[in-house]
Amino acid sequence: MINLRKTHPLMKIINHSFIDLPAPSNISAWWNFGSLLGICLVIQILTGLFLAMHYTSDTMTAFSSVAHICRDVNYGWLIRNLHANGASMFFMCLFLHVGRGIYYGSYLYKETWNIGVILLLTVMATAFVGYVLPWGQMSFWGATVITNLLSAIPYIGTTLAEWIWGGFSVDKATLTRFFAFHFILPFIITALVIVHLLFLHETGSNNPSGINPDSDKIPFHPYYTIKDALGLMFLLLVLLSLALFSPDSLGDPDNFSPANPLNTPPHIKPEWYFLFAYAILRSIPNKLGGVLALLASILILLVIPFLHTANQRSMMFRPISQTLFWILTANLITLTWIGGQPVEQPFIIIGQLASILYFTLILILMPPAGMFENYMLEPKW
């Protein structure tokens, strides 16, 4: 009997994507994060669906509905903790996935990379609108500060901000539409993930050496399914440890207080995964300049493929580029730390220097480093 997975129209697609897919024989654990992101997305959609069954998107009842989920709904506390900390795991995997792409030159698959950047932006938008939903103090003021940035756009800014708000400030209309956005966006993300995989399977995976791996491929199953299963065990271990032992450690204490438009928290800040971009935003004294720098900090990923000057794809054998990459990593950690600090010296100047270094490394230092490495590899005799 002919194998059904190779003949059935639907099973054939799954077979070519996850079972008989030819994969490079040397891809390391850094290639696990794609599948882990897929698992994170499934966890977020499922836990989110169960939360949406009990949540009410009204300013009067949103906060108490979240409290009701945690107190009265069967395992509601667990579902909520998994959803909140699942977002942190999602972004941890995202940052590592993007970092892997930069280190090993995966960005040279331009279509896959561009869809990936769009995915990153969409996930960030989803996380932002989701953070507003519990209607705690930091939720409300975070929404107010970030949506208010739209008013920096010349001429149409104020109108645009009021259009997003559905009024003259963040209120009931804003919360209702943010809930609608938060519900629909994960399904848009799922569609984009399919397109991301479609483009990836057009070219095949990159590998640590950056050399064309066509001469040495192995089937995805069982080799990489078992390897991904190990990654999944680690992911679940960290997620469950967070959700069960310290579920509020990554959240903001201000969100234990219901939103109060008359009382501004002393230090407004987003969740930890946005702090690097928030630090760049704050490091520029001008409002419009800050907004442009914020956008540039993410959209700069789109220009990375055009700044690749090295003859080698991967940084595996390029020590100068490696050094710059790890300086960039340390710089991003510094920006994350600065984003969580109050706006006072010495944090202001550290944030400004780190922001300048971020753009300098990517735009000015990395391209010549690649060219210099090419020169060093040329025979000199």
From Swiss-Prot:
Top-level taxon of the source organism: Eukaryota
UniProt cross-references to SUPFAM superfamilies, sorted A to Z: a domain/subunit of cytochrome bc1 complex (Ubiquinol-cytochrome c reductase), Transmembrane di-heme cytochromes
Gene Ontology CC: mitochondrial inner membrane; respiratory chain complex III
Gene3D superfamilies the UniProt entry points to: Cytochrome Bc1 Complex, Chain C (1.20.810.10)
Disulfide feature: none
Record InterPro entries: Cyt_b/b6_C, Cyt_b/b6_C_sf, Cyt_b/b6_N, Cytb/b6-like_sf, Cytochrome_b, Cytochrome_b_C_euk/bac, Cytochrome_b_N_euk/bac, Di-haem_cyt_TM
Localisation per UniProt entry: Mitochondrion inner membrane
Residues annotated as binding heme b b566: 97, 196
Gene Ontology terms describing biological process: mitochondrial electron transport, ubiquinol to cytochrome c
Protein keywords: Electron transport, Heme, Iron, Membrane, Metal-binding, Mitochondrion, Mitochondrion inner membrane, Respiratory chain, Transmembrane, Transmembrane helix, Transport, Ubiquinone
Keyword Metal-binding appears in the UniProt entry: yes
Pfam families reported in the protein's UniProt record: Cytochrom_B_C, Cytochrome_B
Residues annotated as binding a ubiquinone: 201
Cofactor remark from the record: Binds 2 heme b groups non-covalently.
Entry cofactors: heme b
Residues that bind heme b b562: 83, 182
An annotated Gene Ontology molecular function: metal ion binding
Positions of transmembrane segments: 33-53, 77-98, 113-133, 178-198, 226-246, 288-308, 320-340, 347-367
Recorded topology in the membrane: Multi-pass membrane protein
UniProt subunit comment: The cytochrome bc1 complex contains 11 subunits: 3 respiratory subunits (MT-CYB, CYC1 and UQCRFS1), 2 core proteins (UQCRC1 and UQCRC2) and 6 low-molecular weight proteins (UQCRH/QCR6, UQCRB/QCR7, UQCRQ/QCR8, UQCR10/QCR9, UQCR11/QCR10 and a cleavage product of UQCRFS1). This cytochrome bc1 complex then forms a dimer.
Known function: Component of the ubiquinol-cytochrome c reductase complex (complex III or cytochrome b-c1 complex) that is part of the mitochondrial respiratory chain. The b-c1 complex mediates electron transfer from ubiquinol to cytochrome c. Contributes to the generation of a proton gradient across the mitochondrial membrane that is then used for ATP synthesis.
Family: Belongs to the cytochrome b family.
Note: Heme 1 (or BL or b562) is low-potential and absorbs at about 562 nm, and heme 2 (or BH or b566) is high-potential and absorbs at about 566 nm.
Name of the protein in its database record: Cytochrome b
Organism for this UniProt entry: Sminthopsis granulipes
